[in-house]
């Protein structure tokens, strides 16, 4: 898995998942249309491509597919510190557990959702039960 990696890099081409943050896209591809950029990413990898946009819809998919969208879970936000890293950690966990693309997005989104509902995150990390409850109850 990799994060914020250009579409023409070897690491992207061989990654199982590439998570691209809104910040990275805005800095490196500010002139590009998101749908066209997404197509460049998916055409250059067999892996799952994920564009995150904070609280806005997540765009994800694979080569040869139309992009799919997922709206992150609504939670009471206490601090967004660590949200992106937590989402990415959720993708690693999902990859290791063999989750489907949708399950990966759901799990990573729920993990980040639980994480931003508390502060400080390092002293109170999300539990698997909390993540599963957010998915189930949303």
Feature names for model-found ranges:
Residues 1-39, 48, 57:
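Conserved beta-alpha-beta core of the PfkB/ribokinase-like small-molecule kinase fold
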Residues 34-138:
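Conserved phosphate-binding/catalytic region of the ribokinase-like
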């Amino acid at each position: 898995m990799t994060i914020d990696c250009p579409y023409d890099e070897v690491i992207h081409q061989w990654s199982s998942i590439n998570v691209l943050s809104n910040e990275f896209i805005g800095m490196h591809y500010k002139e590009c249309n998101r749908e066209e950029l997404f197509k460049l990413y998916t055409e250059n990898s067999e892996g799952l491509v994920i564009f995150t946009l904070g609280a806005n819809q997540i765009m994800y998919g694979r080569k040869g597919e139309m992009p799919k969208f997922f709206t992150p879970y609504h939670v009471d936000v206490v601090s967004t510190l660590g949200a992106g890293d937590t989402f990415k950690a959720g993708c690693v966990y999902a990859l290791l557990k063999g989750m489907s693309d949708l399950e990966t997005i759901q799990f990573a989104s729920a993990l980040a959702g639980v994480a931003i509902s508390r502060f400080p995150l390092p002293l109170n990390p999300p539990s698997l039960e909390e993540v599963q409850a957010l998915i189930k109850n949303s």
